[in-house]
């Protein structure tokens, strides 16, 4: 497959996504697969909106129709549309509400201003403190000392 074909497909995909309020954040083609596989990651142009499964499904139809209607590809292909996914880092209030009970790693400064890390299950964040459950005990970390909070796997 020529570089020109890949470039034309990428441009067509980006144009189709833009027409429906999305940006393409990643575009990959796997030409060694049969049929050819095209993977496209998208995000909303409006940063306050999250990409839903319905968004991916609808955009997949539009992009598929655009490719089929063009003369760029003359072979079968699979098209996969997905989002960038969520960040591992919790920053917004809604993140802390959504992931209550999930395992997190907290980086913070102790009383001597030395960076520390601890793990536990997220309980809540208030205006004053972050609370995590560590083996049944609540650890309270002042919000002003928290450097970052990151989702982890249960094993850490």
UniProtKB/Swiss-Prot annotation:
Principal location: cytoplasm
Record key words, sorted: Cytoplasm, Ribosome biogenesis
Any Pfam family matching the protein: RimP_N
One GO process term, biological-process aspect: ribosomal small subunit assembly
Cellular component annotations (GO), alphabetically ordered: cytosol
Compartment(s) of residence: Cytoplasm
Keyword Transport: no
Similarity annotation: Belongs to the RimP family.
Role description: Required for maturation of 30S ribosomal subunits.
Protein name: Ribosome maturation factor RimP
Species of provenance: Prochlorococcus marinus (strain NATL1A)
